[in-house]
């Protein structure tokens, strides 16, 4: 059965399906939208008690529901000094060292940091011998993405690609999954060096947004688009630890890359299969940096 599911991933018109789902998710279709939201909540056991607006009827579109805000204070930031916090609610897929420019996707599967970042070897070299973490956001999860550490935006890269589903089954069976799927890369300058936050698209992920650019929708095609931003002066964009940096309209995966020696140790519980909550302790920073 798993082999059939993987085969369907290759032959399904994923971009077409995603566009159609995106149109429906954005539509304000009244009773139809409400019925689908109610079904989704029941099917995926969404905890609406955490939402700032807990009444499903308050959401005019499925996108409004899916990108819902949480109640104030429901995800308090860990206040310890010298740490990073979890950027999302989700589950740790993999984490560990970046060795010889390779990142672990699943047992026996690796992909390159160069490919993940859109082919720029200079960008990838900034993370040589650093660390990575991959976090999967399930349908029930809160789908806004926050900063694990204060950072100043220096670059954004849009990388076109496939839209394979992103889940443990495809991670085990689709080579180079995260470096093949459509994605948006945001690179920040932090107190411990560069941080890359890679927002990976997937089947039926209608769009990816950032707080500075809105929905990232370059023209269709195979071209990689890059935007560079000032890191000093009045035009620099600095986002504080815990601030929202983006969101998925329908969910997927976040891959983070850290510079060499940025992280001293990962926090307890930051292991494959463990669930995460935005704002909890993620890692101890290297105090020597």
From Swiss-Prot:
Record's keyword annotation contains Metal-binding? no
Residues modified to Pyruvic acid (Ser): 252
Quote the PTM field: Is synthesized initially as an inactive proenzyme. Formation of the active enzyme involves a self-maturation process in which the active site pyruvoyl group is generated from an internal serine residue via an autocatalytic post-translational modification. Two non-identical subunits are generated from the proenzyme in this reaction, and the pyruvate is formed at the N-terminus of the alpha chain, which is derived from the carboxyl end of the proenzyme.
Locations listed in the record:
Cell membrane
Required co-factors: pyruvate
The family annotation for this protein states: Belongs to the phosphatidylserine decarboxylase family. PSD-B subfamily. Prokaryotic type I sub-subfamily.
Show the PANTHER family listed in the entry.
PHOSPHATIDYLSERINE DECARBOXYLASE, PHOSPHATIDYLSERINE DECARBOXYLASE PROENZYME, MITOCHONDRIAL
Q: What function does the entry list?
A: Catalyzes the formation of phosphatidylethanolamine (PtdEtn) from phosphatidylserine (PtdSer).
Q: What is this protein called?
A: Phosphatidylserine decarboxylase proenzyme
State which gene encodes it: psd
């Amino acid at each position: 059965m798993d082999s059939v599911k993987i085969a369907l991933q290759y032959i399904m018109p994923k971009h077409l399906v995603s566009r159609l789902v995106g149109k429906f998710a954005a539509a304000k279709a009244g009773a139809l939208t409400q019925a689908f939201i109610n079904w989704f909540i029941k099917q995926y056991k969404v905890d609406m008690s955490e939402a700032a607006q807990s009444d499903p009827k308050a959401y005019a579109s499925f996108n409004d529901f899916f990108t819902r805000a949480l109640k104030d204070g429901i995800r308090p930031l860990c206040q310890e000094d010298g740490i990073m916090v979890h950027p999302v609610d989700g589950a740790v897929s993999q984490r560990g060292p970046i060795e010889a420019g390779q990142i672990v996707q699943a047992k026996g599967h690796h992909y390159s940091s160069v490919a993940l970042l859109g082919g720029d070897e200079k960008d990838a070299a900034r993370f040589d011998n650093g660390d990575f973490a991959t976090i999967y956001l399930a349908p029930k999860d809160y789908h806004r993405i926050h900063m694990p550490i204060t950072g100043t935006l220096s670059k954004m890269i849009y990388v076109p690609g496939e839209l394979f589903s992103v889940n443990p089954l495809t991670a085990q069976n689709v080579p180079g999954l995260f470096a093949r799927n459509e994605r948006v890369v945001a690179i920040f300058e932090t107190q411990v060096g560069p941080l890359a936050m890679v927002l990976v698209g997937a089947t039926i992920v209608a769009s990816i947004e950032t707080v500075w650019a809105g929905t990232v929708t370059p023209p269709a095609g195979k071209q990689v688009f890059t935007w560079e931003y000032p890191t000093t002066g009045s035009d620099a964009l600095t986002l504080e630890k815990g601030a929202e940096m983006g969101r998925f309209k329908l969910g997927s995966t976040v891959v983070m890359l850290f510079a060499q020696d940025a992280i001293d140790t990962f926090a307890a519980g930051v292991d494959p299969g463990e669930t995460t909550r935005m704002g909890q302790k993620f890692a101890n920073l290297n105090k020597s940096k």
